[in-house]
From Swiss-Prot:
The keyword Cell division does not apply. NCBIfam families: 16S_RimM. Belongs to the RimM family. The PRC barrel domain binds ribosomal protein uS19. Pfam families: PRC_RimM, RimM. Keywords: Chaperone, Cytoplasm, Ribosome biogenesis, rRNA processing. One of its GO terms (cellular component) is ribosome. This is Ribosome maturation factor RimM. Residues 100-173 form the PRC barrel domain. Gene3D superfamilies: PRC-barrel domain (2.30.30.240), RimM (2.40.30.60). It comes from Roseiflexus castenholzii (strain DSM 13941 / HLO8). GO terms for molecular function: ribosome binding. GO terms for biological process: ribosomal small subunit biogenesis; rRNA processing. SUPFAM superfamilies: PRC-barrel domain (SSF50346), Translation proteins (SSF50447).
Length: 178
């Protein structure tokens, strides 16, 4: 049996929304756009808070955002229904390689946000996925939080290893009063 990874070693690929059919398949609301990578490079997924390992036998994507997974050991509808609501994760090391301008959402939490001048703005407290682009919620010491879009016009550099995001503030982007 495969070792269960810790919470900081996994990436979310989706949440089980229901059983699918009679033979134990599960329907997953997906948060990944790398289905081909999953299909060809991932052999094990982890399900639920306890990150129980299951062999990934088959994966289909009937429509964008929906996956149908066949997991080893889940052989009937009752077993599949028992997984409803559980998160499905993979080991981070099994994830598709990132492009130069890509990041994993969880990597942004806690990063320092600084202006290109070096002035500190705050710390990333939350990441909102809007569809068009991600937006970071920056907690500013002694001031109200501010929202910054993760777009090329604003983000000059993102260095996870250094723990910071350097931004170029466009006029009106930050409320200096709050």
């Amino acid at each position: 049996m495969e070792d269960r990874p810790s919470a900081d070693e996994v990436l979310l690929i989706g949440t089980v929304v229901d059983a699918f059919g009679l033979h134990g398949e599960i329907k997953v609301r997906s948060v990944t756009d790398r289905v081909d990578h999953l299909r060809h490079h991932v052999q094990t997924v982890f399900v639920g808070e306890e990150r129980r390992p299951f062999p990934l036998q088959r994966i289909r994507e009937p429509k964008t955002g929906v996956l149908i997974l066949t997991l080893g050991g889940v052989t009937d509808r009752t077993m599949a229904e028992a997984l409803r609501g559980a998160e499905v994760t993979i080991r981070e090391c099994d994830a598709a390689p990132l492009e130069a301008d890509e990041y994993f959402i969880h990597q942004l939490y806690g990063l320092r946000v600084v202006e290109s001048s070096g002035a500190e703005i705050g710390i990333v407290r939350e990441v909102l996925q809007t569809g068009a682009n991600d937006v970071i919620v920056v907690e500013r010491h002694g001031r109200s939080d501010t929202l910054l879009p993760m777009i090329h016009d604003v983000v000059e550099s993102l260095d996870v290893a250094a723990g910071q995001i350097v931004v170029r503030l466009l006029p009106g982007l930050i409320d200096e009063e709050g």
